[in-house]
């Protein structure tokens, strides 16, 4: 039976009100926190650096970008990539904090952290928050695999990340007529942007035919439908309006954030064609007081091409089932299409550090709002941007977070 887009479970109970009105101003993060510093590590391969060292280097880079020092930091945020968690990293980095958060939702952890940092700042728990990401999936041995309650029931069937995303793509094709050619356009757009990024892992512009002729990994996903695997990381500095305005950096203000988790909910039939973005998106838009029509640039999590397509639908940039038509013919290419996306090349071409691409999505959105993206991909008059990510496995249990920012 084909999936019914109208049957997607919507927000219920208390949270339904978030879709209908903005949050109370005294409970909202809107305008109460600014991104003062952003830094992406230039390396994509770091065999001679430790993970902790990479965390320290990105922290230094973000603080220097903001014009602050570690002595100014009183809040710290990290996820599962941080060796020893927040306690060890605060000690290693030489920080003195009065607030910390080690929420781990996989690839979207840093979008979640951004919202949590803004909430902490709005509540007066800290005034300068540092968020770091770093890891070495390319050159280091993989860490022990975390297991959920379903592990013993699924491991025997050799379910892998590629298999599961392949199932999502196949189901979307079955239900809505999406084609491999349409998915390929997402990679094509990313490659057009990556050619201008000197740090991108893959800089060559590709065609739809190139994508379709690349080896099949998990039907219908080809190798070029999959993200790169890179070492590296990134960091952000979030602060109060007063401190941000005292610094010599362009002002980027947070105006909305939402987060959600999707899972099988006690054995219910699982619909592979939508993500938790159907819930995180409306919350962020309601808090920001804007619509998809106001978004000039979008950073969209791109572990696979199908990830992008589904999230564009779920966030409301196009109707459910029409993502294939929306992304085709260069519609995501800056200067060509209606919605420029991932102008650094994204995870499909540039960087997917620690297999957690949410951090770089925020960083490129900040570049666009500051007017610091490469001139060939800079979006004219970019005043409102969206960053969105997922963490976990898109088709089954996963989290999503949506952040909306504006230039001041």
Please annotate each region the language model reported.
Residues 83-92, 266-270, 302-326, 332, ...:
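Short glycine/threonine-rich loop-to-helix capping motif typified by GTGT followed
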Residues 29-31, 79-153, 157-164, 202-228, ...:
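Conserved catalytic cysteine-centered active-site region
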Residues 70-79, 100-101, 129-134, 181-188, ...:
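Beta-strand segments within the central parallel beta-sheet cores of soluble alpha/beta enzyme folds
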């Amino acid at each position: 039976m084909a999936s019914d887009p109208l049957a997607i479970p919507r927000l219920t109970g208390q949270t339904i009100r978030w879709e209908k009105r903005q949050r109370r101003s005294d409970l909202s993060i809107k305008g109460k926190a600014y991104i003062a510093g952003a830094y992406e590590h230039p390396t994509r391969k770091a065999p001679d650096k430790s993970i902790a060292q990479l965390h320290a280097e990105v922290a230094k880079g973000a603080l220097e970008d903001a014009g602050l020092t570690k002595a100014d930091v009183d809040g710290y945020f990290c996820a599962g990539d941080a060796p020893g968690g927040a306690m060890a990293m605060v000690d290693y980095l030489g920080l003195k904090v009065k607030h910390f958060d080690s929420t781990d939702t996989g690839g979207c952890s840093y979008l979640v952290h951004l919202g949590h940092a803004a909430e902490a700042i709005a509540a007066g728990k800290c005034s300068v928050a540092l968020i770091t990401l770093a890891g070495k999936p390319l050159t280091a041995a993989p860490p022990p695999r975390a297991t959920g309650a379903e592990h013993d029931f699924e491991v025997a069937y050799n379910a892998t990340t590629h298999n599961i995303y392949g199932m999502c793509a196949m189901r979307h094709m079955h239900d809505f007529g999406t084609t491999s050619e349409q998915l390929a356009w997402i990679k094509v757009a990313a490659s057009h942007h990556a050619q201008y990024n000197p740090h991108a892992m893959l800089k060559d512009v590709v065609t739809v035919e190139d994508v379709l002729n690349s080896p099949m990994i998990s039907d219908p996903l080809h190798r070029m439908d999959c993200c790169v695997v890179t070492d590296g990381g990134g960091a952000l500095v979030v602060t109060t309006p007063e401190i941000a305005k005292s610094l010599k950096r362009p002002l980027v203000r947070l105006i909305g954030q939402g987060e959600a988790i999707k899972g099988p909910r006690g054995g219910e039939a699982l619909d592979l064609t939508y993500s938790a973005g159907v819930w995180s998106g409306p919350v962020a838009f309601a808090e920001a007081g804007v619509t998809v029509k106001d978004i000039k640039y979008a950073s969209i999590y791109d572990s696979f091409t199908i990830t992008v397509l589904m999230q564009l639908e779920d966030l409301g940039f196009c109707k459910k089932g029409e993502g294939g038509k929306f992304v085709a013919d260069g519609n995501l290419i800056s200067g060509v299409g209606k919605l420029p996306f991932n102008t650094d090349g994204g995870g499909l071409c540039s960087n997917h550090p620690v297999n957690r691409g949410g951090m770089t999505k925020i960083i490129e959105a900040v570049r666009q709002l500051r007017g610091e993206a490469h001139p060939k991909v800079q979006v004219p008059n970019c005043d409102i941007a969206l960053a969105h990510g997922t963490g976990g496995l898109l088709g089954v249990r996963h989290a999503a977070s949506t952040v909306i920012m504006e230039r001041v």
